[in-house]
UniProtKB/Swiss-Prot annotation:
GO terms for biological process: toxin metabolic process. One of its GO terms (molecular function) is acyltransferase activity. It comes from the Bacteria. Belongs to the RTX toxin acyltransferase family. InterPro entries: RTX_toxin-activating_protC_bac. This is Uncharacterized protein sll0720. The lineage of its organism: Bacteria, Bacillati, Cyanobacteriota, Cyanophyceae, Synechococcales. GO terms for cellular component: cytoplasm.
Length: 147
């Protein structure tokens, strides 16, 4: 999916969010080498659909973490696990299976972010995420979280 579909959704706030995500990716050992096309093709749809959260410091409002998710159907889940596909906008809202797609916490706030996801975003839900190999290419397992 190209950025053309999202240009109508790009506004000053979306650009600020993208900048914060780039900052977090640059500070993350796991995401620092990802290409710009990853941001446009994999993360921008989450911003477009408001399926994300940026975490910031209380004192000076600086970004410290990012998570994005999708609500997918069983068929899309199967494809995601088997082929690690890039989800379309339609696929990201296709069902009841909640997947955290990307989680970035380069400054050590992972526990606090998970706590927020479990207690505020997805209380009493089953949430899944893919555990990938170190190159981010191959699915090693599906992690299931009972919130």
């Amino acid at each position: 999916m190209t950025a053309d579909k999202y240009t109508v959704a790009i506004n000053e706030n979306a650009l600020k969010i993208l900048g914060e995500i780039v900052f977090l990716m640059g500070a993350s050992q796991n995401f620092a080498k990802y290409p710009v096309s990853f941001i446009i093709n994999y993360l921008l749809p989450s911003i477009y659909l408001n399926q994300y959260r940026i975490y910031r410091t209380v004192k000076d409002n600086k970004p410290i973490g990012f998570a994005c998710w999708a609500f997918i159907n069983d068929q899309v889940e199967k494809e995601l696990i088997e082929n690690d596909i890039n989800l379309s906008v339609e696929e990201r809202n296709s069902g009841e299976n909640i997947y955290v797609l990307y989680f970035i916490a380069p400054f050590g706030h992972a526990k606090q972010i998970v706590h927020d996801l479990k207690n505020n975003i997805f209380p009493n839900k089953i949430v899944k995420g893919l555990r990938l190999d170190k190159d981010g290419k191959k699915v090693l397992r599906v992690a299931t979280y009972y919130c």
